[in-house]
């Protein structure tokens, strides 16, 4: 009687990772479960880069990566997945209340007092120091002007211009 033994070495399988490209987010939105939501066909853990809570700069096609480690590393390999995400510029919130009337000949100054939720520069039309003209129509003095402001955030790569 002959006896023989054969060593059989099983090759681990690659798990299947499914990760759909996330919807566009706006700068300031931290990465979370809506973006970092890969799934696999076997139990295991996911490690994302960048990590949850990261705020990305504005820009398209930014890479998100996941390393999946299966619970059973004898039967399954560690696997990697990638998707891209687009991050749109945010729009600053500019607040400017209608100013009170001013006396004829008074240059614009404190009326030009808009604020924004991010740092930046305000450009007013008419500019500070401008004395608005008064017109007389049928004996009545009138002066109605549209005051305008353009706001440019210091971080213009992540924020839109507000007009």
Predicted regions, residues:
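Solvent-exposed beta-strand/loop surfaces, strongest in extracytoplasmic domains of secreted
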Residues: 1-163
């Amino acid at each position: 009687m002959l006896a023989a033994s054969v060593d059989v070495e099983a090759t681990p399988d690659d798990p299947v990772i499914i990760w759909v490209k996330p919807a566009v987010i706006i700068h300031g939105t931290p990465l979370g479960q809506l973006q970092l939501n890969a799934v696999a066909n076997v139990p295991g853990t996911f490690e994302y880069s960048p990590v949850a809570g990261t705020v990305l700069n504005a820009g398209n096609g930014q890479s998100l990566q996941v390393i999946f480690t299966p619970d059973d590393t004898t039967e399954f390999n560690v696997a990697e997945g990638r998707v891209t995400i687009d991050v749109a510029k945010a729009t600053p919130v500019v607040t400017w209340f209608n100013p009170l009337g001013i006396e004829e000949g008074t240059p614009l100054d404190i009326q030009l007092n808009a604020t924004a939720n991010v740092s930046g520069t305000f450009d007013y039309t008419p500019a500070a120091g401008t004395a608005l003209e008064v017109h007389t129509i049928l004996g009545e003095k009138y002066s109605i002007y549209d005051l305008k402001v353009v706001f440019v955030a210091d971080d213009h790569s992540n924020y839109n211009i507000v007009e």
